[in-house]
Amino acid sequence: MKTPRKRLGILVGGGPAPGINSAISATVIEAVNEEIEVIGIYDGYEHLLQGRTDMVRPLTIDVVSRIHFQGGSILRTSRANPTRHPDDMQRTLQALQALDISALVTIGGDDTAFAASEVANASNGVVRVAHIPKTIDNDLPLPGGVSTFGFETARHVGTQLVRNLMEDARTTNRWNFVVVMGRKAGHLALGIGKAAGATLTIIPEEFPQERIRLNEVSRMLEAAILKRRVMGSEHGVAVIAEGISEKLDPEELASMPGVEMVYDPYGHIRLGEIPLTTILKRQVQDHFAARHDKLSIVDVTLGYELRCAQAIPYDVDYTRTLGYGAVRFLLSKPEDGR
């Protein structure tokens, strides 16, 4: 007979990504099979850092056995940061203790990973933590050739959408500018642009300098449009990584009409609040207007449509392995204070 263990908690932080529910499902199934009680914590650290213990739910195999097919997160998610203030961390630890949680699985990106590490350190070994890396941006330092979960599904869905936009551009004989989520990294934009066969794709990694001017980007787009005209085509699709916004001079960006610099709890600019496609569209149209040349451009932003898509088999398979592995790690003998 196995010795009863304390509870294992699961929470999700950061933005949604396809495969979260699959990771939750696999974690719960393996934990329950090891006779561990599992508690799902709603909204990341949002309630824990307030010391609240009521925003939780028991997770059983019956609850999670089919959720691996679903997009989104049954535990929802948030960007609440327990490391901003010592009192927040203290309340988080007190809440975990009150819930009798001695093992914690966190699912999230680099910010959630950092918070998980800090929770583990601050607990002095009382709470052991396993982190499952998640982001559609594919910007975490994983082994070479290994993508973050959710990336392949996001690329798959994004490619289908851009393919539709390419046909729309051809049919209406105009240009579409498509900004794709990805924060500082251009992996998702490049993956979608290459797979869809977009006319051009612009990513921040193309620019070695720390800061660039908006005019550099708009002139690249203008040049592509002119080259297409020489080739006899008046239409095209440009895919642009949202990380371009982080390369721009903040003062120049803030001076643009309709731009408000908003920051999340981890201190990052909310790139989704910056209308990059609209800004680039206006500037490129101004370049052509200076030559008395009218240009029709449609601006589109892709990101929120991708984050809660139903995971493709690759990501379902991948996340089930990650969830299983997280529990096996927590059951293993601690080494070097892990």
Language-model features, listed with the residues they occupy:
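C-terminal active-site/capping subdomain that shapes the small-molecule cofactor and substrate pocket
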Residues: 288-338
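Short, ordered loop/turn segments at secondary-structure junctions
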Residues: 13-15, 41-47, 79-80, 109-112, ...
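Accessory alpha-helical/coil subdomains and C-terminal extensions
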Residues: 95, 103-108, 114-118, 122-128, ...
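N-terminal phosphate-binding or glycine-rich loops at protein starts, especially the Walker A/P-loop
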Residues: 2-52
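Glycine-rich oxoanion-binding loops at beta->alpha junctions
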Residues: 1-2, 48-104, 112, 136, ...
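Short beta-strand elements at the ligand-binding edges of bilobed clamshell
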Residues: 140-154, 303, 309-313
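Short glycine/serine/threonine-rich phosphate/pyrophosphate-binding segments
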Residues: 17-27, 48-49, 86-88, 107-117, ...
